[in-house]
């Protein structure tokens, strides 16, 4: 346990680190300038950690350019001879983590989906209809 003398002792303060100035607009000027410098340093440190992501709607000059490669494809027509067509395709980015799944063309011979079938609405009417409002009968009589 601590002795009673150690409990009662208070550590001495180093007064050199404190700035004592008279109150008023000029009195706290040193304190404000020091805190402003610290805030600037913190802002500069934060700016270094910010990464800007590309925006889809950004102008082309700010967007990353995709490289294009030339590919030759055979076009076969029954009536004409085989032709070669050169097209420009964007190269696949290897760094990209997200990519769209490959699009598979559907054969025309396959059966259409159930959603594409013709929709038929069946309306069931009760045998006895509800009575019409009283004013519709008076309008029918006058007309």
UniProtKB/Swiss-Prot annotation:
Region (Disordered) spans which residues?
1-143
Acidic residues bias spans: 77-93, 103-115
- Which spans does this entry mark as compositional bias, Basic and acidic residues? 34-46, 61-76
Its recorded name reads: Uncharacterized protein YtxO
Q: Which organism is it from?
A: Bacillus subtilis (strain 168)
Q: Mind giving the lineage of the organism this protein is from?
A: Bacteria, Bacillati, Bacillota, Bacilli, Bacillales
């Amino acid at each position: 346990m601590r002795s009673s003398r150690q409990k009662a002792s208070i550590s001495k303060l180093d007064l050199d680190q404190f700035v004592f100035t008279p109150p008023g607009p000029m009195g706290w000027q040193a304190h404000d300038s020091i805190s402003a410098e610290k805030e600037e340093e913190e802002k500069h440190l934060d700016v270094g950690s910010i990464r800007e992501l590309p925006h889809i709607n950004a102008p082309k000059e700010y967007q990353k350019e995709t490289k294009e490669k030339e590919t030759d494809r055979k076009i076969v027509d029954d009536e004409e001879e085989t032709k070669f067509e050169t097209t420009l395709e964007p190269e696949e980015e290897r760094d990209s983590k997200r990519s769209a799944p490959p699009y598979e063309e559907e054969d025309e011979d396959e059966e259409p989906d159930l959603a594409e079938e013709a929709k038929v609405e069946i309306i069931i009417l009760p045998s006895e209809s509800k009575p019409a409002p009283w004013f519709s009968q008076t309008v029918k009589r006058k007309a």
